[in-house]
Amino acid sequence: MKDPRDVLKRPIITERSADLMTEKKYTFEVDVRANKTEVKDAVEEIFGVKVEKVNVQNYKGKSKRVGRYTGMTSRRRKAIVKLTADSKEIEIFEA
C-alpha cells in the first residue's frame, strides 16, 4: 500500500456516521489489506488533518443467489477515524 488513494476507497455517509461527525469521527471504506497505520497516514496526507486514533471493522461477504447459482459478495473493511481536538474539519463531508 504505497499510494494513499489505494488505501481509502470512499467515504461512508449514513445517519450514524453523520452523527459521529459532530465528535470529529469520519467513516471510510478502506482496502481489506490496509492496517490502521496505513489508514492514518492516508487520511493525514490526503486531507491535511491530524488523526488521533483509527478503529476498523471487518465485514464478511454475504451469500447471494440468482436462480440456482450461488455466489458471494465481496468482503469489506470500514475505518472510523477520529481527528485531534485542534485539527480542522474534513470538507468532503460538509455538503
UniProtKB/Swiss-Prot annotation:
Q: Which GO terms describe its cellular component?
A: ribonucleoprotein complex; ribosome
User: Which Gene Ontology BP annotations are present?
Assistant: translation
Query: Which terms does the record give in the GO molecular function aspect?
Result: rRNA binding; structural constituent of ribosome
Whether Ribosomal protein counts among this entry's keywords is yes
Keyword list (alphabetical) reads: Ribonucleoprotein, Ribosomal protein, RNA-binding, rRNA-binding
Pfam families, per this entry? Ribosomal_L23
Q: Which family does it belong to?
A: Belongs to the universal ribosomal protein uL23 family.
| Function, in words | One of the early assembly proteins it binds 23S rRNA. One of the proteins that surrounds the polypeptide exit tunnel on the outside of the ribosome. Forms the main docking site for trigger factor binding to the ribosome.
Assembly mode:
Part of the 50S ribosomal subunit. Contacts protein L29, and trigger factor when it is bound to the ribosome.
The name this protein goes by in its record: Large ribosomal subunit protein uL23
Which species is listed as the source?
Bacillus pumilus (strain SAFR-032)
Which gene does this sequence derive from? rplW
